[in-house]
Amino acid sequence: MKLDLWFLVPGPSGGTILLGADGGLPTVQVEGSETEAAVIAVAAYLRDAWGLAAPVLETHPKWKEVGEGEPIPTLVLTEPARAAWTPPPGLAFAPVPATPGEVPWPIRPRADELLAELRGNTPPPELRPRWMRRGWFDRASTWMRTASSDAGRPLTGDPRPFFLRGISALLRAPTDGPDLFLKAVFPPFHAEPVLTRLLAERFPETVPTVVAVEPDEGWLIVEDIGSAWVGDVPEADRPAALARGARALVGLQRAMAPDDGARRTLLDAGAPHRPLADLVASVAAAIGPDGFGVGDGGIQPERARRVVEAVGAAVARVEAVGLPESVVHGDFHSGNAAIVDDRIVIIDWSDAAISNPAIDLVTWIAWSRDRQAEIDAATDAWLDAWSGAVDGEALRAVVDEVLIVGAAYQIVSYDGIRRNLEPATRYTMTGGGDHFLKTLEAILDRREAAV
């Protein structure tokens, strides 16, 4: 994918920014990811073409506003360049302009906003994550080097940005063995490092090994597992892989369910408690006029009423089956589980909570879309894995309700995520809640059509 990059590079002295001879922002087109991994191509260009080592604070790719195949307008903000750096020919530092000039319209509002901050030397807003603030990259890189060395895994090269978005950031660095990743998470996911370490200690076959954590910063270092994601295996093999993934998560959940002490440890470490009993009120708020679960401003009252009533009925039927509360993943999809040797390894426990494990099925089949063989294999394996802990036939009878409560849970999750993002970056998490609302309503429509 072609990225149409527009740069905001502050000068080493305050009140200046890198500009072209025409007074506009520097711009170039490069090949790269159109989403949160755009930072890889951006950092490589700055490093290799300009010799600029200033950390990238933000990439702002607006992929939804352009047609398929068109270059993605992407605004880039860096830390100030060092005084010893020499700009490329045709570029020079000049006073911060009042406007960004002729930039593509999708990135114009963000360019105006960031230029105003630079002109006024104002601090970033409260909701801007730490990795989009000056000094974070050097601090995180220094800790990554020290912590990795202390763990017996010294780095053999510099950490480089791998992923950058409002809810998380990743740095990647080489070692004599597999690469290491430093993951940083935003405040609602602040407990992920400690939770992941606790789960990895209890379930080393299913959760990646944690090399180090920094709880106050919300950092963890994990090893690159270097294997194929379940969602990337050949389509003919995917039903079996999805079945294995379902069994792996349920096995972990069944082991945790009777262990009150282990669940209490997770809660004490910061895992939220999200009982199904709270789901009806939470989803009503998430799709209401002040909600962020399905875009801004909610949905029509009559439509919302139908959804809330359906969620209430589904909660009652699912709770009657008696699935025990346990740790839930919260974002269990086929891009968060890998086949490593002969086992399934589940990553990205950002959304982990203590709740009813019914909520994890809907995401596990979401990426299969209309591939019914995959959906059936994953669903059957999930149901079979819970049989014995509960009445398997009773659980199978409420599969629709399981999917409804899972979809509602996701809408509430997206509401919490989006309201904790800086407004200008909420677009990066728009659409997820809408997808699960459609999933929920499709079940209701199918049932009504069958009557």
Where are these regions (language model features)?
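Conserved Nudix-box catalytic region and its N-terminal flanking loop in Nudix hydrolases
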Residues: K2, G11-A53, P61
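Juxta-kinase regulatory segment immediately upstream of eukaryotic protein kinase catalytic domains
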Residues: G101-P159
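Active-site activation/catalytic loop segments of kinase-like enzymes and analogous catalytic loops
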Residues: P357-V390, L403-A424, D434-T439
